[in-house]
Amino acid sequence: EFSRSQRVSQEMQKEIALILQREIKDPRVGMATVSGIELSRDLAYAKVFVTFLNVLTDNADPDTAKNGIKALQDASGYIRTLLGKAMRLRIVPELTFAYDNSLIEGMRMSNLVTNVIKNDVERQVNPGSDEEK
């Protein structure tokens, strides 16, 4: 059983994702995905966590995420207006955007595990070239 705030946040996540995909034309936003929403108990404030897929490329500018968040924050009033039209809420929450680095952190952890496994296999194949003597 879900509470009302959980249901509203799930629906908001879907709607904001659609709005970002269809309505926001700012090039700084690029390929943004909504990874989660924290909604206050009174539904007046929403913290929207976003991930930018163009940050995942190797040649990405380190400020890409910062610029994307700034662009979303600048457009938050427009996004809030569109959200109010899409959802039937008495009070449309005030939106703040935050960068969610869990996807990048997860990929980094996965690479670390892959490298450890690869090194372990190499040690089993070549036991004489090990540092431990």
From Swiss-Prot:
GO aspect biological process, one term: rRNA processing
GO cellular component terms, alphabetically, are: cytosol
| One MF annotation (Gene Ontology) recorded for this entry | ribosomal small subunit binding
State the InterPro entries in the record: KH_dom-like_a/b, RbfA, RbfA_dom_sf, Ribosome-bd_factorA_CS
Subunit annotation:
Monomer. Binds 30S ribosomal subunits, but not 50S ribosomal subunits or 70S ribosomes.
Q: What is this protein called?
A: Ribosome-binding factor A
Source organism superkingdom:
Bacteria
Q: Does the keyword Cytoplasm apply?
A: yes
Arranged from A to Z, the UniProt key words for this protein are: Cytoplasm, Ribosome biogenesis
Q: What is the protein's major site of localization?
A: cytoplasm
- Function according to Swiss-Prot or TrEMBL: One of several proteins that assist in the late maturation steps of the functional core of the 30S ribosomal subunit. Associates with free 30S ribosomal subunits (but not with 30S subunits that are part of 70S ribosomes or polysomes). Required for efficient processing of 16S rRNA. May interact with the 5'-terminal helix region of 16S rRNA.
> What family does the Swiss-Prot or TrEMBL record give for this protein?
Belongs to the RbfA family.
Compartment(s) of residence: Cytoplasm
